[in-house]
């Protein structure tokens, strides 16, 4: 089974993604900010991270940089940002 970490500060988004992905048989882990995501990755084998860019404490970019220090797990950003200057 593949484990997916969903990291978003909006509980409704985490819940919606969790319901959708868990129904396909993925192991789902939740984090509500960057620090929680990093802690979860230290304790659990994660195969994919779905992460919001705008979060309190550590934003998605800062969190990804920290994740990259120890892991090459794929990170997919989810965001409401839509302007050209917001592109990563």
For each predicted feature, which ranges?
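Receiver (REC) domain active-site loop signature in two-component systems and cognate sites
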Residues: 55
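Acidic catalytic/metal-coordinating carboxylates
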Residues: 32-36, 59-62, 86
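Two-component/phosphorelay signaling modules centered on CheY-like receiver
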Residues: 11-29
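Alpha4 helix (beta4-alpha4-beta5 surface) of REC/receiver domains from two-component response regulators
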Residues: 62, 69, 73, 82-88
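Conserved phosphotransfer cores of two-component systems
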Residues: 42-46, 66-73
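Active-site residues of response regulator receiver
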Residues: 8, 52, 79
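Acidic, metal-coordinating helix/loop segments flanking the phosphotransfer/catalytic sites
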Residues: 30-48
